A protein has these predicted regions:
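Bacterial Sec-dependent N-terminal signal peptides
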Residues: 1-30
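Glycoside hydrolase catalytic-domain context in secreted enzymes
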Residues: 25-726, 735-745, 749, 773-785
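Extracellular/periplasmic metallocenter environments
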Residues: 732
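Short beta-strand elements
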Residues: 751-766
């Protein structure tokens, strides 16, 4: 249907929905939400009111780049209403119907902090900044759901105190490929880690009486042509990887809403797939909330409503007309529309807006900054530490900090994942706060260069009508480097990389360090090492990068990710030894990009403007691929060093024969000299007599409390039949095969410390699922070795 169809009438509808719907006074009282049953309220609604409720309003989606064009944008279609009335900068809202006691819900981005306008018209005395919490890759690297839940509780308080009902987070999509521009928002290459971390965040946020929207359902694993690309995936890969993460989070935390994704899945837009949204999500997983589109997602409003995609965001006037016409002409049943309305009303009943919560606009940002800083330290990963380069020696007093990101440290990614925060503590500032002397001339040089270059790039972008490009790294002269080696006690280099919504990362300039960057690292290392001084590199990045050609130049490497607004303070906490590093990788760093199993199938075909992407690697994503095909990674899944050492011993199983539930215990002991925490990862190798399987899969994990030197803790893990099951496509069932299994407990996927054998005597059919979501074409999938 043309966007211009009956547009004049659409404008009239839009005006009606700008704040509410009004109907002529009636002679008898009408039902009221909360006082009457939802069925009675729905029965009192007009068709127009129902259609307006399921078509929301708010910000237009971000302008989309024209395919194959380097500049210029496709203008977004006209949207209904504005969001400025209640919470300026919020992403959108639902339509209020005052005569029936139905308020408007306010929806806001984003995954690392509330994303609203920090300044408001007519209010010069108050600001509305939000806390920038660590990004998803860092939170997953804590391997500690309790830490993530604590972040969620603080996060949810800001959601509530700023007058928001539903947070459009978390994002839980799998790290299929390291070039995905939004991997920073997501958690892991492994569905167990991703699902558990998302559940923790949801539980924390929703403990405040506000809602979340888990996204992007499903298989939104790239930004290139995300609005139209067709993800072609086998049923098994969907069930075991790309749906399992959502299932874990939804069943363990019951988010109020689910957001469907932009892309097509096996030929159909996800927002229009009844088998995905109703059969799998509602019938199989028992989801009770409502489903909304991503902003401007999908194609047909009628098809979306038929599929069970309850709320269309942010709606257009013509969509309301389409829905009304569809009901009147029997192409959309009133029963389906009523069910979708009921799903939305059930959530409205729980909302702060319905309960008339008197939000303060004054959350405790100082307290939340403390939460953010602590969480950031828990998820930073020590990748390299030669000759005790870290923690920084007590005889170090002065530091030469190189790298743009030492002074303009990246708190988080861009797009809807960005946060309007009051400040970001830079790496240099954090070290200064810790008592170190930073080279003032270097700071002046970097600050001047970055400010001047930023202004130039913005001017160029405005003239060409495109987004500004990233500021290139300032390259210090040989003379400057040698001078700093003479005058400073150590060198610190911060490597910064950013990405975000709307585009994927560039292999040559974002994933890989540029030749000039690599050359500068070598020059700094050579100069400082010649003076007997250490060189430490901090990685201020949102996703995996190529470390070939330069990592050997560093004595120590700290993967700090994008740690939120307290970045520099948290980094200093780790570098100084105030906090022992305990983070572990939740995604693999390959030796080279070509080793990535999806490298030749990302972002799809035809090259340059893909309309489809084949998930040929099937279930062999991340460590499942590297371990099965015996490919050595740069840093394996689960890897992370500490300033102390731990032993993992005394693995015991409750029984050598599986009888429905297996309990495993291990003893972790701090055998080093400083207090620290260890993560124990439980992998299982399963028999492959019926179908191929990965060499091993993560089935459980746990993190110790802070153990003092010599202190021990017993960790307990429970494994059930569902944990052992694989999805058998022919039977459309989850089946635990009979045979011999090996349970492995270790500090990473390649650092296994203890093993134990057990057997399953009879094949167990754990669950029979619907035979849905079939790919339209045959896929020549990887089959393991």
């Amino acid at each position: 249907m043309s966007l211009c169809k009956n547009y004049a009438a659409g404008v009239m509808l839009a005006m009606l929905t700008a704040s509410s719907i009004t109907v002529k006074a009636q002679t008898k009282p009408v039902p009221q939400l909360g006082k009457n049953t939802i069925q009675e309220v729905i029965a009192a609604m007009t068709l127009q009111e129902k259609c307006m409720l399921v078509v929301g309003s708010g910000k237009a989606p971000r302008p989309a780049m024209k395919a194959g064009v380097s500049s210029g944008y496709v203008a977004p279609p006209p949207m209904i209403g504005k969001t400025e009335r209640k919470v300026p900068g919020a992403a959108g809202n639902t339509t209020a119907i005052p005569r029936l006691g139905i308020p408007s819900l306010v929806l806001s981005d984003g995954p690392a902090g509330v994303r609203i306008d920090p300044h408001r018209k007519g209010d010069s005395t108050h600001t509305y900044f939000a806390t920038a919490f660590p990004v998803g890759t860092l939170l997953a690297s804590t391997w500690d759901p309790s830490v993530v839940e604590q972040v969620g509780r603080a996060f949810g308080n800001e959601v509530k105190e700023y007058g928001i009902d539903i947070l459009l987070a978390p994002g839980v999509n799998i790290h299929r490929n390291p070039l995905n521009g939004r991997n920073f928002e997501y958690y892991s290459e492994d569905p167990l880690v991703a699902g558990k971390m998302a559940a923790a965040l949801i539980n924390g946020v929703q403990s405040n009486g506000v809602g979340t929207s888990i996204k992007h359902f499903d298989a939104n694993n790239q930004e290139t042509n995300r609005n139209s690309v067709n993800a072609i995936i086998s049923q098994r890969a969907l069930r075991e990887l790309y749906l399992k993460n959502f299932r874990i989070a939804i069943t363990e935390a019951q988010p109020w809403t689910v957001m469907s994704s932009y892309n097509k899945l096996n030929g159909t837009y996800t927002a229009e797939r009844h088998d995905l949204i109703t059969t799998v999500l509602r019938d199989e997983w028992k989801f009770k909330g409502f489903v909304m589109t991503d902003w401007g997602g999908g194609y047909s409003a009628v098809a979306e409503e038929r599929a069970g995609n309850d709320l269309i965001m942010p709606g257009r006037p013509d969509q309301i007309e389409d829905l009304m016409s569809a009901v009147q002409h029997d192409s959309l049943s009133m029963k389906v529309l009523d069910e979708n309305v009921a799903h939305i009303l059930n959530i409205i009943l729980k909302s702060p807006s319905f309960q008339k919560y008197a939000y303060s606009d004054k959350p405790d940002l100082k307290a939340h900054a403390i939460v953010s800083r602590k969480a950031a330290t828990e998820g930073m990963i020590l990748l390299k530490n030669e000759d005790h380069a870290l923690p920084i020696s007590k005889n170090i007093k002065s530091i030469a900090a190189f790298g743009n990101a030492s002074y303009f440290t990246i708190a988080g990614g861009t797009g809807s994942g960005d946060v309007n925060k009051a400040y970001v503590i830079s790496v240099a500032k954090g070290l200064a706060n810790a008592g170190y002397t930073l080279d003032a001339n270097l700071e002046t040089s970097y600050t001047t260069f970055i400010n001047d270059t930023t202004q130039k790039l913005r001017a160029i972008a405005r003239a060409a009508h495109h987004w500004p490009g990233p500021v290139p790294e300032m390259i210090a002269t040989d003379e400057t480097i040698n001078q700093k080696a003479d005058n400073s006690d150590m060198a610190l280099i911060t490597i910064g990389r950013n990405a975000g919504e709307g585009s994927d990362r560039n292999l040559e300039t974002n994933y890989t360090l540029t030749p000039s960057e690599q050359q500068q690292i070598k020059k700094i290392a050579d100069s400082f090492h010649a003076k007997g001084k250490k060189v430490v590199i901090v990685l201020n990045i949102g996703g995996v990068i190529d470390m070939n050609g330069w990592k050997d130049n560093a004595d120590g490497i700290l993967l700090a990710w994008q740690p939120g607004e307290e970045a520099g303070n948290a980094i200093a906490d780790i570098l100084t030894g105030k906090v022992d590093p305990s983070g572990k990788l939740a995604t693999t760093f390959p030796v080279k990009y070509e080793d990535v199993p999806s490298a030749k199938n990302f972002p799809g075909l035809p090259a340059g403007n893909p309309d489809h992407v084949i998930y040929q690697e099937g279930i062999y994503v991340g460590y499942r691929y590297y371990d099965t095909y015996k490919i050595k990674p740069m840093y394996e899944f689960g890897y992370g060093l500490s300033y102390t050492n731990f032993s993992i011993n005394n693995l015991k199983l409750s029984s050598p024969v599986f009888n429905g539930l297996l309990t495993a215990t291990v003893t972790v002991k701090n055998t080093g000299e400083v207090a620290g925490k260890e993560v124990v990862q439980v992998y299982i190798s399963a028999p492959t007599k019926t179908i191929d399987k990965p060499a091993q899969e993560l089935k459980a994990f746990g993190k110790t409390r802070l153990l003092q030197p010599g202190e021990s803790q017993v960790l307990t893990f429970k494994i059930n039949a569902a944990d052992l099951a694989s999805f058998h496509t022919d039977a459309s069932s989850w089946i635990t095969d009979s045979g011999n299994y090996v349970l492995k407990a270790g500090a990473s996927s390649r650092d296994i410390r203890q093993t134990a054998n057990f057997s399953v005597s009879k094949t167990i059919v754990v669950e029979k699922d619907h035979n849905v979501l079939k790919p339209e074409v045959a896929i020549d999938e990887y089959k393991g070795k």
